[in-house]
Structure formats: C-alpha cells, structure tokens
Amino acid sequence: MSVKPTKQKPGEPPTTGHSWDGIEEFDNPMPRWWLWTFYVTIVWAIGYSILYPAWPLINGATNGLIGHSTRADVQRDIEAFAEANATIRQQLVNTDLTAIAADPNLLQYATNAGAAVFRTNCVQCHGSGAAGNVGYPNLLDDDWLWGGDIESIHTTVTHGIRNTTDDEARYSEMPRFGADGLLDSTQISQVVEYVLQISGQDHDAALSAEGATIFADNCAACHGEDGTGSRDVGAPNLTDAIWLYGGDRATVTETVTYARFGVMPNWNARLTEADIRSVAVYVHGLGGGE
C-alpha cells in the first residue's frame, strides 16, 4: 500500500511513500552522470536523424544531410569487385572453352566463380550438391541428355531447354502415346515391359516380345534401335539404371502415357557470358564432364 511518509531521520532523503510489510524505499535522485548520459543520447539521436536517413515517409524516407546510403556502399563494393576482376573475366570470355583448363589461374577463377553462380541460380532445381532430383538431371554422373563436353554444357546453359524465350533453345518433345490415343493400354503395357527388359529389370517376357515391335515402330526414331538414346534430340538412354523421372513399371507407364516436358531457362537473358562460361566450367569439373 502507499502511505504518506511520517518518519524521517535527520539527514535521510525522503521516501517514496510506498510501504510493503514495513519496508520503504528512499526517493534518491538519479546520479548526475546518468542524467547527462541520457541527455547526450537525446542530442545524439536528434543529430543522427538529421544527418542520416531516419524517418519513413509515404513514398520513401528522409535522406539525411550527408546523403549516406548502405545500398550505395554495397553498389560501390560491387563495382570495385567488378573492376578488380575485369581483366580475368575478359580473358575468360576471350579464351576458347576447351583451352581454359590449360591455364591453372583461369581455371581456378572460373571454377570458383562458377560455384558461386551455381549456388545462386542452379541449386533450386539441381540441388546444392548438383545431384539433381526427380525431373532435374544429376550433374555428377556421366549420363548426359544433350552432351557432357564443355561446349555442349555451355550451349545448354546459354540457350536452355524447351523454353519459349530463346529461339535457339534445345528442343525435343515426346509424344503422349496414351493421352493422344497413339497406343492403347495393351500396347503401352507391352512397350513398358520391353523397356524394363532392356534396362535389366524384372519384366514379363511375353509382353516384352510384343513390345519390341512397338518400340521399333514408335520409339526407336529417338531412343535408337538399341534404346541407348540420342543426344541430338535429348532422348535418354533406356538401357542403364539412370532415370530422370523413375524407372519402375508405374512411372515408365506414366511417362509413355503422358510424356514428359521439362523446361530449363535460357541463362543468357540473366547472366553475363563470363558467368555462363564460369558455371559451365564448374559443372564440367564436377565429375561427369567429358
């Protein structure tokens, strides 16, 4: 409870008037150094709000008298970095792709720069370790749809795959054999069993024998007579154990029925030539480059 102080010894400061179980609190003034510190912070805050950007407005904020901007600082740092690396980046652009590996300094720069570009733009689909995911190719192995040499990788990164924003994008389109009525369900089952056979999986031998003819008539034009695929049209090898969407019976049936149509952006619309070359060198050096 709060009561009016009634007792005060000579020389003692007054109390606050609060008494809790007989315990009272002196009403001592704050130390002078604390008050002056408080006043200084007020002056500093006023000065800061005048000199630096501080107060939000409807369409922006106050700029401050000295015009300081952390964004401008970052932009200056970026420009300074670009200027410092301008020579080697120009060298990277001017050097033949196949000759970059012969220059240790250039190769190291391209690999490091490419890793940064990859982490910023490519990991969303291909994964942070470049091992890919369902529908997104693994870049660590030597199974390439469009070619794994440095020039082929550069072309793929530059123009992309099946996009509508680059006339030179790599393009191929698998027919929807089931959805468009090109094959009936029995024929699809037969050709699926044949694909399982040539890929070394458990299969129905009788259905596979029928599927061989269907494969030759409908699939061999792209995947080859032996099913090993064709890089000219981005047709995958069906005889190995590497599958972009899955190699089990149900998934292969779905692929034959509805087809697949993966798309990759053309990075020449977003990255510089030096960046594209850097990431091509990086991907080529991951282990599966040819």
Curated annotation (Swiss-Prot):
InterPro entries in the cross-refs: CcoP_N (IPR032858), CcoP_N_sf (IPR038414), Cyt_c-like_dom (IPR009056), Cyt_c-like_dom_sf (IPR036909), Cyt_C_IC (IPR008168), Cyt_c_oxidase_cbb3_su3 (IPR004678), Cytochrome_c_Oxidase_Subunit (IPR050597)
Claim: Disulfide bond is one of the keywords in the record: no
Membrane topology (UniProt): Single-pass membrane protein
A GO cellular-component term linked to this record: plasma membrane
Cytoplasmic side: 1-37
Pathway recorded for this protein: Energy metabolism; oxidative phosphorylation
One GO-annotated biological process of the protein: proton transmembrane transport
Localization: Cell inner membrane
Keywords: Cell inner membrane, Cell membrane, Electron transport, Heme, Hydrogen ion transport, Ion transport, Iron, Membrane, Metal-binding, Oxidoreductase, Repeat, Respiratory chain, Transmembrane, Transmembrane helix, Transport
Top-rank lineage group of the source organism: Bacteria
Ranges for domain Cytochrome c: 109-199, 206-287
Any GO MF annotation of the entry: iron ion binding
Keyword Cell inner membrane part of the UniProt annotation: yes
Cofactor(s) in the UniProt record: heme c
Chain intervals for the UniProt region annotation (Disordered): 1-22
Major localisation: membrane
Alphabetical list of Pfam families matching this protein: Cytochrome_CBB3, FixP_N
Disruption phenotype: Single ccoP mutant as well as ccoP rdxB double mutant give rise to colonies with very deep red pigmentation compared to wild-type when grown on SIS agar plates in the presence of O(2). The same mutants don't have cytochrome c oxidase activity and they accumulate high levels of a yellow carotenoid spheroidenone (SO) during anoxygenic photosynthetic and diazotrophic growth. Expression of crtA in the ccoP rdxB double mutant is approximately 60% higher than that observed for wild-type. Disruption of crtA together with ccoP and rdxB mutants prevent the accumulation of SO.
Binding-site positions, heme c 1: C122, C125, H126, M264
Annotated binding of heme c 2, by residue: M174, C219, C222, H223
Transmembrane spans: 38-58
Periplasmic side: 59-290
Subunit-level organization: Component of the cbb3-type cytochrome c oxidase at least composed of CcoN, CcoO, CcoQ and CcoP.
Free-text function comment from the UniProt entry: C-type cytochrome. Part of the cbb3-type cytochrome c oxidase complex. CcoP subunit is required for transferring electrons from donor cytochrome c via its heme groups to CcoO subunit. From there, electrons are shuttled to the catalytic binuclear center of CcoN subunit where oxygen reduction takes place. The complex also functions as a proton pump.
Protein name from the UniProt record: Cbb3-type cytochrome c oxidase subunit CcoP
Lineage: Bacteria, Pseudomonadati, Pseudomonadota, Alphaproteobacteria, Rhodobacterales
